[in-house]
């Protein structure tokens, strides 16, 4: 089912709990190298680590800082810059992810605010067999392999947040 979005989505506790149910695994760079398919990253440290390892990243979603403020990152030319408040999935983030995936071109999305929830629209718009890699503070990297089951779960969450049936 195709959803149409016309406003920012604000997460509630129920949605947060449902998101925590996602089937992800802690993964290493070697695990990611074995994937061989499209990779989308969320987070500056994760993106930097995969770039250093020579991995080909299709879409990068970053906020130019780390959670603990240990390091900041620089803006890159030709990046898409958007706003996204903590606890929300802004309409501009949704549109940037949708257009980036549909364009089939490598893209960097730089967020003023928080990038953590970008995983949700990435899964919604992402192709089956895409690997989404994001950072888990004090733990490492987590991987979600997009399949029909996780897409269905995300669609349900977005439908509820969007207030449409």
From Swiss-Prot:
NCBIfam families xref list: PRK01160.1-2
Stated family: Belongs to the GTP-dependent DPCK family.
The species this protein was found in: Picrophilus torridus (strain ATCC 700027 / DSM 9790 / JCM 10055 / NBRC 100828 / KAW 2/3)
Listed pathway(s): Cofactor biosynthesis; coenzyme A biosynthesis
Keyword presence, GTP-binding: yes
Molecular function GO terms recorded: GTP binding; kinase activity
Function as written in the Swiss-Prot or TrEMBL entry: Catalyzes the GTP-dependent phosphorylation of the 3'-hydroxyl group of dephosphocoenzyme A to form coenzyme A (CoA).
Protein name: GTP-dependent dephospho-CoA kinase
Lineage: Archaea, Methanobacteriati, Thermoplasmatota, Thermoplasmata, Thermoplasmatales
Catalytic activity: 3'-dephospho-CoA + GTP = GDP + CoA + H(+)
């Amino acid at each position: 089912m195709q959803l149409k979005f016309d406003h920012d989505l604000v997460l509630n506790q129920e949605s947060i709990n449902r998101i925590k149910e996602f089937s992800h695994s802690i993964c290493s760079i070697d695990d990611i190298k074995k994937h061989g398919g499209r990779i989308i990253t969320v987070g500056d440290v994760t993106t930097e680590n995969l770039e250093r390892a020579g991995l080909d990243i299709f879409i990068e979603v970053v906020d130019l800082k780390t959670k603990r403020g240990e390091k900041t990152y620089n803006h890159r030319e030709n990046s898409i810059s958007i706003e996204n408040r903590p606890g929300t999935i802004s309409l501009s983030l949704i549109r940037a992810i949708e257009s980036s995936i549909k364009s089939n071109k490598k893209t960097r999305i730089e967020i003023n605010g928080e990038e953590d929830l970008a995983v949700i629209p990435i899964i919604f718009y992402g192709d089956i067999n895409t690997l989404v890699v994001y950072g888990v503070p004090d733990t490492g990297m987590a991987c979600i392999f997009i399949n029909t089951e996780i897409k269905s779960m995300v669609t349900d969450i977005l439908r509820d947040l969007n207030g449409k049936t």
